[in-house]
């Protein structure tokens, strides 16, 4: 449902911004061989893992156990933040690669090579980026939460 192929078909079936339950039911289902289906399922599971790992890093997650900047020992806050920013970039790059791979496979399965591109833009990936300003806000929020007893 989150592939470029489903977005393409949904835009054809319902060119407005909203979709009815019947629109989703009208989506065509391609005959994908078992091996290809397993590959798509496995890489989709990895994409879900990456997104969950990212989500757990935020205070609004029910699995949140602390901010990464304070969980590892570094000789400076900058080095801790740099490690976090590098991890965010690795996750982002892996997710972009996975999403492009899934799109490429589905475009091929539906024979839409002439209509769609599997290129995934950075802005399309909803995952944390290493942002000094936002990460400072998160660190302060976490510190205040600790002082107020939120994490004890």
Question: Can you describe what each PLM-predicted range is?
Answer:
Residues 1-26, 35-36, 42, 46-50:
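Basic, amphipathic alpha-helical recognition segments used for DNA target recognition
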Residues 28-152:
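Non-catalytic DNA-recognition/assembly elements of restriction-modification systems
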């Amino acid at each position: 449902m989150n592939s470029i192929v489903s977005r393409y078909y949904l835009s054809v079936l319902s060119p407005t911004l909203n979709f009815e339950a019947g629109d989703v039911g009208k989506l065509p289902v391609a005959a994908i061989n078992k091996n290809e289906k397993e590959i798509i399922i496995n890489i989709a599971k990895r994409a879900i893992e990456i997104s969950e790992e990212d989500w757990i890093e935020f205070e609004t997650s029910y699995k949140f156990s602390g901010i990464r900047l304070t969980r590892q020992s570094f000789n400076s806050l900058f080095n801790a933040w740099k490690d976090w920013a590098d991890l965010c970039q690795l996750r982002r790059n892996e997710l972009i690669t996975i999403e492009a791979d899934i799109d490429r496979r589905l475009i091929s399965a539906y024979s839409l090579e002439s209509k769609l591109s599997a290129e995934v833009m950075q802005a399309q990936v909803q995952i944390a980026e290493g942002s000094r300003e936002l990460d400072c806000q998160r660190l302060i929020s976490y510190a205040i939460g600790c002082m107020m007893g939120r994490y004890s």
